[in-house]
Amino acid sequence: VGHGATRAALGLETAALGHSLDMANNNFFSHTGSDGQSVGYRATGAGYTWSSVGENIAAGLSLSSVSAVVQAWVGSPGHCANLMRSNYTEIGASKFSNPASNYNVYWTQVFGRPR
């Protein structure tokens, strides 16, 4: 993240993986989960107590490598803003693939600041 050291957080990692799995296994691409819930709900459900939370998602075979997805996020103003936002101090990220789904590869980054 663009403002200095950001550390990994297990709760954010769990929320990220859960959302990537949900999108891949239920064949959709959205910040809203198949249960209608938001990133904040997913982070809380994963045991993360937050004061600020945000999310980047990406999907598609053209984004199958870490370098490709990071390049896409940096090239997108909204996604890049999340990457550079100074109020986020922790991160969790995941990638999940399901060849039977429309996009095949699904990425989720969850950013947070603990309360």
Which stretches of residues belong to each language-model region?
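Short, well-ordered surface patches within globular domains
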Residues: 1-46, 86-91, 96, 100
